[in-house]
Amino acid sequence: MSRAGKSFAPPILGLGLLLAACHPTGAQYVSDLDVVATTHDATFDFAVPSTYSRPDRIPLITGDPTTSPPEQLDPQLTSLILNTLDNEMSAIGYTKVNVSAGPDLVITAGALKVTNVTYYYGYWCTYWAYYYPCYPYYPPVVGVSTYTVGTLLIDMAPFSTTTPPNNQIRGVWTAVIRGIQTGSASTDQTRIVNGISQAFIQSPYLGRP
């Protein structure tokens, strides 16, 4: 499994190139193509928040933000992904609460259904307007293309019930996990858990003291 971690300074546009890169020695197994890339806002203090919330669904991102309602990832994979996220967040000191309780952070996840789709934070409102105030993210942002089918995108942002400056929300952490769908249920489940765990391993700045 390949790993990459970057901090936000100027907007980062290179994750797509990383994910599209060829395996240096030639892939023998599907798992050889796995990539986990993470980025974060280096100015954000992740030790301050104590609570988070997340939706209970994971949309399939098709490249058409007008699709309503969006298709959803199948329940079994959704449950595995969200439970793994909860376990990782709990292990580093964050407590999950209902969104109505006013969490410090909100985490959303999406899975790509198509290849060669361009992903921008600004389109996230399309998928989460029912759950989270619909404001586009502002730089630092990630704009990438050529993710592969089955890539899992995980975003973290501060939660607010008030209108943010310039009507824009600052994203503070993103994980991009390629290779969560191969057609083999048992293999996919292992790769999902390993990929999410690796995203947290390579993000040591996350967590409370």
Functional labels for PLM-detected ranges:
Residues 32-65:
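Compositionally biased P/S/T/G-rich terminal and signal peptide-adjacent segments
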